[in-house]
Amino acid sequence: SPSSRTGYPRRQRICRVTPLAFSLWLASGMVHSVSAAGIVADHGAPGHQQPTIMQTASGIPQVNIQTPSAGGVSHNTYSQFDVGNQGVILNNAHNNVQTQLGGMVAGNPWLAKGEARIILNEVNSRNPSQLNGFVEVAGKKAQVVIANPAGISCDGCGFINANRATLTTGQPQMKNGSLTGFSVERGEIQITGKGMDASRTDYTDIIARSVKINAGIWAQDLKVTTGRNNVDIAHGQTEKKAADASSQPQVALDVSSLGGMYAGKIRLVGTETGVGVRNAGHIGAQAGAVTLTADGRIENSGSISAKTDVHLATTRDLHNSGSVYAGQDTQIQSDGAFTHTGSVASRRNTRIQTTRLTGSERSLLAAGVKDDGRLAEAGNLTVSTTGVLAAHGQVLSGGNMQLKGQGLDLSNSRIQGQHTGLDAGSGNLSTQNVQLSAGTLSARTAGHFSNNGGTINADTLQISAQSLSNHRGKLIQTGTGDFSLNLPGGVDNREGLLAANGAVRLDALSLDNRRGKVQAVQSGSLQVKTTGAVDNQQGSLTASRDVRLNAQALNNDNGLISAAAGTGRIKTQQAVSNTEGRMESAGRLGISAGSLNNHQGTVVSDGLSVTLDGA
């Protein structure tokens, strides 16, 4: 009876919607979800900028992008744009199309008038976008732009069927329906965890106030720009904004030891004054060049390499404790000081310009280095500083070498080159304890040249200095040409060796050759001329042919002066001392002096002439 009824019976289902029909309704826009895997359209944006967000039949988030403008830009605005591990599909196909992530995808009804050339995904949020999966363009290839001023984090992100991928914290700039570029004020992009795979994308852009790379980036053509800038859509022009009161990041681009860039070619630009670049990982261009410019300090403790060229430029200091290598040319420019404890090399030419260079004993500066580490027969090394150039490690060149600064300190280094030029300008030149081998060596300084303990071998030696110290050093010319030293100051050759196969001519203020050797070895003559004294105690002045000595005074005690196959001539204004010394010539020997002390000395010749004027 009606009074005994406790309620109405439950309604029975009279029909059901199959999954296939429901997916078709979603694809046609009849039904849509407001979010999928963290992707939410911004309902405060104009309607023509709100994409339709749904899922494919296989459960992959799908975005039916909005109708493109006349400029081919589909402008899509979100309040959240996070991509999960399963990825997301940006539907740029008017008709049904097969995708890698989601299989068959129904056509996008918003594209009745044509597909997009650029898919702009603009995020209005206080939170960074989390990109943890691939972004696939269904249908026609397009440039994918993800712009979130709050920042972007990529952990396993990547792109499929995109001809260009752009991650930016800049505000998109639109003009007459075209995307003209990005205005960057803030925001950081981080690459972490599983990194970023843009290897199937022609061009990859990362544009932000600062960038941290703690994982790998794989790309074909990678460009990273940091700082407060206006950057054009093609990432070809960057306009630096005037400084403001906003707090600066500590580092503009930071590549950790776990991070790396692996691309065909790489261009890195940091424009913010005083904010530098730090690389502890690997930056490698497998097909092209690596270019890094910064308006702040560059620190490299990792590796930077390129198939072609490497170009590093900074307006501040540069510190390299890692490795830099170019398959073609390496160029480094620093408006500050260059501190170098690692290696800088190239297969062809290496060029360095800086205000001051300091290279440790473990450092390497090289040009003409083959892949196996051996020197080729070509490749020039040029290092130029406006201040002191100090290089204490290996300095190697398969071809020519030019080291120029206001003072050169090459002590304890190993130097090898064909035509090697050392120019210390108005400063001093030091090759103390050096090991130097060259075809032609040109050493020039307006100051003092010190080769104490150093060994220099060259086919041709050309030395210009105020004075020379070769204490326990060796200056050896191995070619057949003449060796000339013309110095306004003195020569200190104590326990040292000055030698040449050809003639040796020494013109100086004085010569201290105690326990030293000055030799014209094979077929040359020796000529020594000083306005001061020559001290040859326990030393030797020898030539295979003639010997000519003209000095204020001569001390040859326990020393040797020998013209093995020629004549000898010794002329002094003051005394000649030959105590227990030896003077000899195969031909005639002439001695003209103020006085002569030959106590227990030996004078041997084929005709002796002695003139004493009593001075």
Walk through the language-model features, giving the residues of each.
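Intrinsically disordered, low-complexity regions enriched in polar/acidic and amide residues
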Residues: 11, 537, 572-573, 599
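Short, T/G/N/S-enriched strand-turn elements that build extracellular solenoid repeat scaffolds
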Residues: 79-81, 107-111, 129-137, 152-159, ...
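Well-ordered beta-strand segments characteristic of repetitive beta-sheet solenoids
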Residues: 65, 81, 109-111, 118-124, ...
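Compositionally biased regions
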Residues: 2-5, 24, 29, 34-36, ...
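Beta-strand-enriched accessory nucleic-acid recognition/scaffold domains that flank the catalytic cores
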Residues: 21
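Solvent-exposed adhesion/ligand-recognition segments of exported proteins
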Residues: 3-5, 9-11, 16, 24-286, ...
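Intrinsically disordered, low-complexity segments enriched in small/polar and acidic residues
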Residues: 41, 55-57, 366, 446, ...
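Compositionally biased, intrinsically disordered low-complexity segments enriched
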Residues: 14, 51, 302, 313, ...
